[in-house]
C-alpha cells in the first residue's frame, strides 16, 4: 500500500474555494448547520457569514439552510446515510476542540497554536481567560481573507490574536517565534482536520516539530483515523468518490480522493506516545454518545474505520533519537 492516490503535489497552492482549501469552507458550512440545530452543541455565529463571503454556491446554501444536506442523499439504490450525520459529527468535533482549549487555558496555559486554522473563529468566539495569546497559522491568502471578512463584520477577538501567515511546508516555526511564541512556555496545540491532508512523511515532520517546540506540560489535540487495513483503503476511496459524485450532481465540483494522502503512515497516537506525550483517544461514536447524540447511521458496506479524537499532555522533555 504505497500509492497516495492524491492529485496534490509539492508546492501546490489553493484558496478557500479551491483544492484542499475548500475543505475549510465545507467545515465552516457544517459548523453553521450545527449552530442552527434545534438544541445546538456549539455556537459559531461567524461560520455562516464566512462561508457566504467565500462564495461557493452550494456551500452557501447549506450554511444558510436554503439547502439541506439530506438532499444530497437522493439515490435510493446507494444511500449515503453517514453524510446525513455531518452536522452532528461536526458539532461534536467542534465541541471537543472547544473544550480542549478552554480546559487547557483555564489550567494556566497562555499560549494557543491553531495549525492550519482555515475559517476557525475560536479567537473571536471562545471566552478565553485573560493573558491568552492565540496564534493562527495558515496560508497568507487564507489569513488575510478571514481577518478582513471578520473585520468587515465588526467582530473583535476575545484573546490576543496573532496571525502567522505561512505555509506549513515552509519554516513556520521561525514565523511563529517571530510572532512572539515562546517555546519555553507550555502551549495548547490543535491539529483539527489536518493530518490526513499531509503526506505521511510531512505528518511525522509536523508532529516532531510540535514536540520540539513544546515545553513539558504542553497539551495537544488532534483528529486522526484509526488504523486502516490495506483492503479497506479502496473501500474508503470508493465511498469518497461516491460522495464527490453527489456533490458534483448539485453543482459543486470537488474530488475528495485527490485531496487526501493515502498509503502507509505512522499512526499519530503511538508516534506521539514514543515522544513523551501521554494521550487518550476517543472514537467518534463514543464522542457522539458522550454528547447525548444517537448512534450515527452505519454503512454496512463501508470500511470499519473510525475517526479518533486525541488529546493529551507532554509529560517529559522530548526523547532524543537513539545514537546510530
From Swiss-Prot:
Pfam families: LCM
Keyword Oxidoreductase among record annotations: no
GO BP terms: methylation
GO MF annotations in UniProt: methyltransferase activity
EC number: 2.1.1.-
Residues at which S-adenosyl-L-methionine binds: 138, 167-168
Keyword Cytoplasm attached: no
NCBIfam families the record matches: mthyl_TIGR00027 (TIGR00027)
Functional note: Exhibits S-adenosyl-L-methionine-dependent methyltransferase activity.
PANTHER family: S-ADENOSYL-L-METHIONINE-DEPENDENT METHYLTRANSFERASE YKTD-RELATED (PTHR43619), S-ADENOSYL-L-METHIONINE-DEPENDENT METHYLTRANSFERASES SUPERFAMILY PROTEIN (PTHR43619:SF2)
Protein name per its UniProtKB record: Putative S-adenosyl-L-methionine-dependent methyltransferase MMAR_1059
Originating organism: Mycobacterium marinum (strain ATCC BAA-535 / M)
Lineage of producing organism: Bacteria, Bacillati, Actinomycetota, Actinomycetes, Mycobacteriales
Amino acid at each position: 500500500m504505497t500509492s497516495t492516490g492524491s492529485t496534490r503535489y509539492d508546492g501546490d497552492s489553493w484558496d478557500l474555494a479551491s483544492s484542499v482549501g475548500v475543505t475549510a469552507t465545507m467545515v465552516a458550512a457544517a459548523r453553521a448547520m450545527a449552530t442552527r440545530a434545534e438544541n445546538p452543541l456549539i455556537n459559531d455565529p461567524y461560520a455562516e457569514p464566512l462561508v457566504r463571503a467565500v462564495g461557493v454556491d452550494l456551500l452557501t446554501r447549506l450554511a444558510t439552510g436554503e439547502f439541506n444536506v439530506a438532499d444530497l442523499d437522493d439515490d435510493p439504490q446507494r444511500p449515503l446515510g453517514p453524510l446525513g450525520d455531518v452536522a452532528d459529527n461536526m458539532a461534536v468535533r467542534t465541541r471537543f476542540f472547544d473544550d480542549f482549549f478552554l480546559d487547557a487555558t483555564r489550567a494556566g496555559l497562555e499560549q494557543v497554536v491553531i495549525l492550519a486554522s482555515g475559517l476557525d473563529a475560536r479567537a473571536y468566539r471562545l471566552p478565553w481567560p485573560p493573558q491568552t495569546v492565540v496564534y493562527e497559522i495558515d496560508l497568507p491568502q487564507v489569513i488575510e481573507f478571514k481577518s478582513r471578512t471578520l473585520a468587515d463584520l465588526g467582530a473583535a477577538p476575545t484573546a490576543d490574536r496573532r496571525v502567522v501567515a505561512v505555509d506549513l511546508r515552509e519554516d513556520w516555526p521561525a514565523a511563529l517565534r517571530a510572532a512572539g511564541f515562546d517555546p519555553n512556555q507550555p502551549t495548547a496545540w490543535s491539529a483539527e482536520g489536518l493530518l490526513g491532508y499531509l503526506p505521511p512523511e510531512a505528518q511525522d515532520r509536523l508532529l516532531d516539530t510540535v514536540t520540539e517546540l513544546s515545553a513539558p506540560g504542553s497539551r495537544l489535540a488532534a483528529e486522526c483515523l484509526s488504523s486502516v487495513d490495506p483492503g479497506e483503503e479502496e473501500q474508503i476511496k470508493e465511498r469518497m468518490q461516491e460522495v464527490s459524485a453527489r456533490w458534483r450532481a448539485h453543482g459543486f465540483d470537488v474530488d475528495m480522493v485527490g485531496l487526501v494522502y493515502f498509503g502507509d503512515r505512522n499512526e499519530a497516537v503511538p508516534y506521539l506516545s514514543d515522544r513523551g506525550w501521554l494521550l487518550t483517544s476517543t472514537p467518534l461514536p463514543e464522542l457522539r454518545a458522550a454528547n447525548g447524540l444517537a448512534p450515527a447511521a452505519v454503512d454496512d458496506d463501508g470500511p470499519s474505520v473510525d475517526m479518533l479524537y486525541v488529546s493529551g499532555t507532554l509529560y517529559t522533555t522530548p526523547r532524543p533519537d537513539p545514537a546510530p
